[in-house]
Regions:
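Mg2+-dependent endonuclease catalytic cores in nucleic-acid-processing enzymes, primarily RNase H-like
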Residues: 57-182
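Charged, alpha-helix-enriched surfaces in structured cytosolic catalytic cores
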Residues: 2, 48, 134-138
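ATPase catalytic-site recognition across NTP-hydrolyzing enzymes
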Residues: 1-41, 55, 175-184
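Hydrophobic alpha-helical membrane-insertion segments
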Residues: 29-31, 51, 105
């Protein structure tokens, strides 16, 4: 089912899947709006064997670095080197701080932006209170909206990561549970289990 959904554009494999299979497939041919460059760092944590650093030019994924699990200071030096090479300032580096590894890296990368997925939902002036469980959920809903509307693109030179990226995006599911009146997504552990 995954091959047909991802590569043959035969619709979503699961009713709670947030991103349509054809929209995921189109990421490689879309033309995402260019803008400010930034880096997003997902540090290897418990059970993970790699750190992933993505480099964005607006809504276009320009580059992707996958690093073997490294110790804090060594990883910070690698990220600093990448930032210089990619011309990304510290204030444009976002570090996922949900795990211990991310917190340590962010401590060394003075001036970076710390992302706390369990944190408070973002609101803009004039918006009604958002009904998301947390910031992580809000970001996944926004990502799904951007992917499904074909607003995001991925550099075709990154095709070696195509299967991994596609499987990860396909695994993001909304929860069919509005008991607290909040939109929710499947927990990280459940998503990781689906990916395998």
């Amino acid at each position: 089912a995954s091959f047909a959904a991802l590569y043959m554009c035969e619709g979503s494999a699961h009713p709670l899947q947030m991103m349509h299979a054809d929209a995921i497939n189109d990421l490689w041919t879309n033309t995402g709006e260019r803008g400010e460059r930034c880096m997003v760092v997902d540090v290897a944590g418990e059970g993970q064997d790699r750190t992933v650093v993505s480099v964005w030019d607006g809504l276009h994924l320009e580059n992707l670095y996958v690093e073997a699990k490294s110790r804090g200071p060594e990883l910070v030096a690698i990220i600093d080197s990448m930032a210089k090479m990619e011309k990304v300032g510290r204030s444009r580096i976002v570090v996922d701080c949900d795990g211990i590894g991310g917190m340590g890296v962010a401590d060394y990368l003075k001036g970076c932006v710390r992302f706390h997925g369990g944190g408070k939902v973002m609101t803009q002036e004039g918006d009604e209170a958002a009904n998301f469980q947390n910031l992580r959920t809000q970001c996944y809903y926004l990502l799904a909206e951007l992917v499904n509307s074909r607003a995001i693109s991925i550099n075709p030179d990154l095709s070696e990561h195509r299967v991994d990226i596609s499987l990860e995006l396909e695994a993001i599911r909304r929860k069919d549970d509005m008991a607290e009146g909040k939109l929710k997504i499947a927990p990280k552990e459940e998503i990781k289990e689906m990916i395998g």
